[in-house]
């Protein structure tokens, strides 16, 4: 298996009771090829930069297990704009290291409050400009208000506008939860779309439709651990090893709806992940 968990937060998983070395061991035992550790603020960006050295002994026990990482400021932390200089210093310092993948997560989140929309948009714009300057992929987080209606997602619309204004950027819509129509403008620019454990939830009808209609060549899977554990672990602390459940659900869904061969689905998703990992210029 050459599947990665393309988005997780090992530091937050550890704060919920699963130590980092245990998460790594569980992922290795689940036959994952690797994972992408995502930053949300200056503290986690610094943590990510020390991962390889701190857990080198655990990683040596695995044959070719790959640990990649990013640095960025989560939109819900956009009131900490003054920390961007420190985060971007980390990006520039580690940019050419093979383990460093890109920028993020960044984006727009209107779910709890729109109080810091101006700061969120400024943060997103600065991340996008740095991504273009350094030829790095960007990991995008979008979440709308509780009154979300399919096809009317302001956070996605605003993010698309920002991406187009800066131009020349590739990336991934992480933990995608919206419609086919909202994903396609990004797909047409060569972006990837990543599904979390939400895909396995029974009532995720709009997401199921998107997972069937979107081109297989753009799809990836993730955990967003420790959040959003997939069925059959829903309600538990999520971890990278659980990404296999989302993958299996996606394979079953497309096989049943489209008649696609499950092995070919998995092979293509593995290729998609490798393409994403090579977005870094």
List each model region and its residues.
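Mid-domain alpha/beta scaffold segments of enzyme catalytic cores
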Residues: 1-281
